[in-house]
Amino acid sequence: MNAPRFAAPARRTKKLPPLRVGIGGPVGSGKTTLLEMLCKGMRERYDLVAITNDIYTKEDQRLLTIAGALPEARIMGVETGGCPHTAIREDASINLEAVERMLARFPDADIVFIESGGDNLAATFSPELSDLTIYVIDVAGGEKIPRKGGPGITKSDLLVINKTDLAPLVGANLEVMASDTRKMRGERPYVMCNLKALDGVADVIAFIENKGLLTV
């Protein structure tokens, strides 16, 4: 009797490796909404997969699946079981393994999105895990947020300031926030967004394409 044959793992056919985009920010700032909008805005042109992080659940994976951001098989939820910061920086092994598993399923993926669990302004991604980092804050957190600094504010490749529509309700001055952001970030870019209304999403997509050399 012949031994059973098993299909060899699919191999990547594209020359360039996939771009890994890390999305971080405090709880409730709009990370999952941004990821949803990016997937919906880029999935027709690029082969996408997404990894979400939660401490004790896979809630963000569920929300993205319900929203139809990507087919269910292309969204993987990771339960970190501890500090969200650790899982993307000091010991990113659980996320590195998730990336490896997703690329085994979809070897020709162009972009791997990795959404961190909600964390503070000190959160940063390990360079082993992410090629580009996007940090999301929101106006509802207060006009002072950009002035507080922290690696997420000052060192991320792109800062997204979300929920601009709430500025009048919380007494935040968007011009002051923009000025403070420029002082804290120097030449590093930022985008003012109202993600629910898709305002600013195109700018984030353009940044990913240009900075990630996807348009070359």
UniProtKB/Swiss-Prot annotation:
* UniProtKB keywords: Chaperone, Cytoplasm, GTP-binding, Nickel insertion, Nucleotide-binding
Q: Which Gene3D superfamilies did the record assign?
A: P-loop containing nucleotide triphosphate hydrolases
Cellular localization per UniProt: Cytoplasm
Q: Does the keyword Repeat apply?
A: no
User: Listed GO cellular component terms?
Assistant: cytoplasm
Does the entry feature the keyword Heme, yes or no?
no
Q: Which Pfam families match?
A: cobW
Its BP terms in the Gene Ontology are: urea catabolic process
Record-linked InterPro entries: CobW/HypB/UreG_nucleotide-bd, P-loop_NTPase, UreG
Q: One MF term in GO for this entry?
A: GTPase activity
Q: Which residues bind GTP?
A: G25, P26, V27, G28, S29, G30, K31, T32
Record-stated family: Belongs to the SIMIBI class G3E GTPase family. UreG subfamily.
The record's function comment reads:
Facilitates the functional incorporation of the urease nickel metallocenter. This process requires GTP hydrolysis, probably effectuated by UreG.
Known partners and oligomeric status = Homodimer. UreD, UreF and UreG form a complex that acts as a GTP-hydrolysis-dependent molecular chaperone, activating the urease apoprotein by helping to assemble the nickel containing metallocenter of UreC. The UreE protein probably delivers the nickel.
Q: Give the matching HAMAP family.
A: UreG
Q: Which NCBIfam families match?
A: ureG
Tell me the protein's name. Answer: Urease accessory protein UreG
